[in-house]
Amino acid sequence: MEVGFLGLGIMGKAMSMNLLKNGFKVTVWNRTLSKCDELVEHGASVCESPAEVIKKCKYTIAMLSDPCAALSVVFDKGGVLEQICEGKGYIDMSTVDAETSLKINEAITGKGGRFVEGPVSGSKKPAEDGQLIILAAGDKALFEESIPAFDVLGKRSFYLGQVGNGAKMKLIVNMIMGSMMNAFSEGLVLADKSGLSSDTLLDILDLGAMTNPMFKGKGPSMNKSSYPPAFPLKHQQKDMRLALALGDENAVSMPVAAAANEAFKKARSLGLGDLDFSAVIEAVKFSRE
């Protein structure tokens, strides 16, 4: 199976590498073309524009940083729309809002192409291990045709119906994750300021009902003030903002998420946006100094 892949950031690079390792022919594009070099060493082909990738491949996957990037790749000069046509499938796995997905869907289908949104739950390590959770919506036939690729990229794929539902589900998942991370950060800081061992707190949490992979995986490095970026904080804050907008649309009160968003915004103002989202703990520390 031959696929195109647009966007080689932390997630896109790991995902496209998995496709290559599992026998897929992969043609890649990235705005900074030098990021394609390692994938070329593993057998990927490179195109100089998204349009060229679409022209070459029946199926093209995109994994981009935000709604602006997702729209740019589709609508700008040399973009997806220049070559999308009947028989072509476009799978956008970026985390965007439902409005952005709907706009892309309308443009793709208006040219005769087929569209699936497929945002993922999971960060760098699950992407490298092929253990993402795929939250797909849109063209059902294209979803089913994409299963061989999805099975390489993730441990389970959900089909959620019409376009927009995948985006909404992803934002809700990330809103919960961000709120949990902020509460977790407050707990670690509170333990430390109370004269208790935050490492002991991790052990206690791991033995009880609140045990989870995020606390177990992030806690030790947070206690060492180390935040290698698996999921950049700036993207977590973007998702919190979009989730709060979804709450506004549906008249859902979300004070916990709103407070967490403020902490992530504070962390960004401290210059921590490119670090892992667990660096939000530094904003919690700052607020208590």
From Swiss-Prot:
**SUPFAM superfamilies noted in UniProt:** 6-phosphogluconate dehydrogenase C-terminal domain-like, NAD(P)-binding Rossmann-fold domains
Cite the active-site annotation. Answer: K170
The catalytic activity, as recorded, is: glycolate + NADP(+) = glyoxylate + NADPH + H(+); 4-hydroxybutanoate + NADP(+) = succinate semialdehyde + NADPH + H(+)
Q: Which UniProt keywords apply?
A: Acetylation, Cytoplasm, NAD, NADP, Oxidoreductase, Stress response
- What are the protein's GO molecular function terms? 3-hydroxybutyrate dehydrogenase activity; glyoxylate reductase (NADPH) activity; NAD binding; NADP binding
Superkingdom of the source?
A: Eukaryota
Q: What class of enzyme is it?
A: oxidoreductase
Report further notes: Follows a sequentially ordered Bi-Bi catalytic mechanism involving the complexation of NADPH to the enzyme before glyoxylate or SSA, and the release of NADP(+) before glycolate or gamma-hydroxybutyrate, respectively. Although GLYR1 acts as an aldo/keto reductase, it has no significant homology with either mammalian and bacterial NADPH-dependent SSA reductases.
Q: What name is this protein filed under?
A: Glyoxylate/succinic semialdehyde reductase 1
Give the species this sequence originates from.
Arabidopsis thaliana
